[in-house]
Amino acid sequence: MPLRKTKKKKVLPKSPRAPKLQPSELVIITGLSGSGKASVLKAFEDLGYYCVDNLPVDLVPQFADLVADSPEINRAALVLDIREGQGLDRLPATLRSVRQIVKSNVVFLEADDEILLRRFSETRRPHPLGISMPVKASIESERRRLAPIRKVADMMIDTSKFNVHELRALIFDRFGHARTQDHKKILVSCVSFGFRKGVPDDADLLFDVRFLPNPHFVPEFRPFTGRHPKVAKYIRSFPQTQEFINRISELLVYLLPHYISEGKSYLTIAFGCTGGQHRSVMIAEDVKKRLATAGYNVKVVHRDSPK
């Protein structure tokens, strides 16, 4: 009996991996219980950092790898505290390996014993070590256990004289100004349009995306726009789509600081396809996300797409 030939499956080329648009940065927040770590983490979150609370020490190197490799995460902050237990003893050694993976800063928070006692009294929450000992003894024990970590910290903040708002302002001043203030000086608009209805008059930069496969010729996609998940997935499935988004994003991140230095306060980037329904819409959305991740103030406008 003759052997039946089997058809070989067609293997599609993998889409190129998105490049990092900004240098990676990891901030590790640690310190005494009641010193304000939750408030500081919230401040980093408001600055656009990807935030994680109470990650096990043994997972920190893996998280550092993620921050270093992921195009979606440029800046991250995580909290490590006494809840980790004996794992904290390994933190100084872990930090040495993490610093070889990604730029890292350790922020150590502390406060006077009297202030910590008052905060625990006001919140009526037990100290993490206070199940079998008084709060004051727990604070003293925690201070001793965290002493080796305090020695390797890049920044120490005594929160005794700070309220929540002042502590937030301090974090914004130390970590937010250099990274976000200049970015906020310019408003970026990503506009999608159709060439059928003409080119936007206010476009500073214009890109023709009609070289991408057109979903209009796929009957099931015709009623929808590039914002529909299935349509967007279809357009992204082509290697040239990801290559274009990667290259355009890199170009824009290079150009924007130069526009800012010349005093430009807004920039309109237009992406055009035939009807302004599918390809240009999807590209404008994806580029907007990339620029927002890089810290810029970005809005998206779909001129010719149904609202």
From Swiss-Prot:
Annotated residues for binding of GTP: 81-84
Pfam families to which the protein is assigned, alphabetical: PapZ_C (PF22740), RapZ-like_N (PF03668)
Keywords from the UniProt entry: ATP-binding, GTP-binding, Nucleotide-binding
Top-level lineage group: Bacteria
GO MF term (any one): ATP binding
Keyword Cell cycle: no
Binding site for ATP: 31-38
General function of this protein: Displays ATPase and GTPase activities.
Sequence similarity: Belongs to the RapZ-like family.
Protein known as: Nucleotide-binding protein Acid345_3782
Organism (species): Koribacter versatilis (strain Ellin345)
